[in-house]
Amino acid sequence: MEKPVVLGTLGTVYGIKGWLKVNSFTDVAEAIFDYNPWLINQNGVWREIQVSSWKRHNKGLICKLDGIDVREDALALTNVEIGVAADLLPALPEGEFYWRDLIGCSVVTTKGYDLGKVTELMETGSNDVLVVEANVKDAFGAKERLIPFLEEQVIKNIDLTARTIEVDWDPGF
């Protein structure tokens, strides 16, 4: 099985009937419930579980999972990751990408200099930022570069098949 896409985590237990708080990583928090069944990561093993009910509670979300009917069963699920199969995510329009697809891509300047590989992305408010781990023998001595994800200005081309991102960026920066 391909590693699921993590959309959130289960939080603390709520009440005595097996309800759990939900920490959603989706842009719209409630969108995590658009996917059913969930895959949960318990002790490194992903297993499928159905969401039987959910609701807003105070400023957060809580859910009831099939087969989890008492507080003690719910306690075993606190802090586990919630994932879904990647093929359940909606297709994106041309030119848009999921962050998970960009992680691991090589980043190369328009002049052919290999800057390294994308290890993560950060949301800064004004624009997203690629975190690029530099190659071991980087000529500029860089260990990591933060490159703004500004299409057309900085990001010139993304080829997911070749797993490369071409950027207009000074390697010394």
From Swiss-Prot:
Keywords assigned: Chaperone, Cytoplasm, Ribosome biogenesis, rRNA processing
InterPro entries noted in UniProt: PRC-brl_dom (IPR027275), PRC_barrel-like_sf (IPR011033), RimM (IPR011961), RimM_N (IPR002676), RimM_N_sf (IPR036976), Transl_B-barrel_sf (IPR009000)
Subcellular location, record wording: Cytoplasm
Molecular function via GO: ribosome binding
Cited Gene3D superfamilies: PRC-barrel domain (2.30.30.240), RimM (2.40.30.60)
Keyword Ligase attributed: no
Subunit structure: Binds ribosomal protein uS19.
Protein name as it appears in the record: Ribosome maturation factor RimM
Organism: Aeromonas hydrophila subsp. hydrophila (strain ATCC 7966 / DSM 30187 / BCRC 13018 / CCUG 14551 / JCM 1027 / KCTC 2358 / NCIMB 9240 / NCTC 8049)
